[in-house]
Amino acid sequence: MNNAIRIMDLPENERPREKLTRYGVESLSNIELLALILRTGNKSENVISLCARILERCGGLNGLFNANRGELLNINGVGEAKASQILALLELTKRFRSFKSGENYNITNPKDAAYLVMEEMRWLKQEYLKVILLNTKNYVIKVKDVFIGSLNSSIVHPREIFLEAIKNNSYSIIICHNHPSGDTTPSKEDINVSNRIKECGKLIGIELLDHIIIGNGVYISLKEKDIL
């Protein structure tokens, strides 16, 4: 028996495209978003079931984002066509992320800063500290890794951060680091490092605008929380 079901064969209230139109793209699950890309299932399952299994096999979005052609083809029901669709989607995502790192990206609020680095930092298995260098109009000049490892005020030296800022004629900076646990609650050391960098910035005339902590798809702004 051929059980292949297209999205259009599903009840209307279960169709991802109709849900997108009615409620917005944000309302769709990861499975439904992937289903819109792949469009059809196979002889034994519909596209929703197939996409659920793909994400489960890959270990979620993180695994899918890092999957290669061979790994995708090893998933039952994924042939050359569907593997190519997924790889094209992943490549577009990577290129878009790279595009956003350019100097045409303007930061007007903490959300802008968080979204600039979110997709890269949310999956990291250890802590990274990045500095976003800004010009006088808050356009991004550069995003630079300055430290890898747990933040500690005795290890993280402001010199490394402001050296990059001075080299790139930065007017102000935003620092961002990730919590691999996904919990964005700032630690005592996070706060100490922020204050130390802020004070050093005052001395040399380069303002620290914010410290953004990245979790798994969420963030916290120390500025918004009145911690900085």
Curated annotation (Swiss-Prot):
Keyword Transferase on entry: no
Matches recorded under InterPro entries: MPN (IPR037518), RadC_JAB (IPR025657), RuvA_2-like (IPR010994), UPF0758 (IPR001405), UPF0758_CS (IPR020891), UPF0758_N (IPR046778)
Stored SUPFAM superfamilies: RuvA domain 2-like
GO MF terms, alphabetically ordered: metal ion binding; metallopeptidase activity
UniProt keyword terms in alphabetical order: Hydrolase, Metal-binding, Metalloprotease, Protease, Zinc
Keyword Protease: yes
Single biological process term from Gene Ontology: proteolysis
Residues annotated as domain MPN: 106-228
CDD domains per UniProt: MPN_DUF2466 (cd08071)
Motif (JAMM motif): 177-190
Superkingdom of origin: Bacteria
Pfam families, A to Z: RadC, UPF0758_N
Chain positions recorded as Zn(2+) binding sites: H177, H179, D190
Family: Belongs to the UPF0758 family.
Protein name, per record: UPF0758 protein CTC_02075
Organism annotation: Clostridium tetani (strain Massachusetts / E88)
Lineage: Bacteria, Bacillati, Bacillota, Clostridia, Eubacteriales
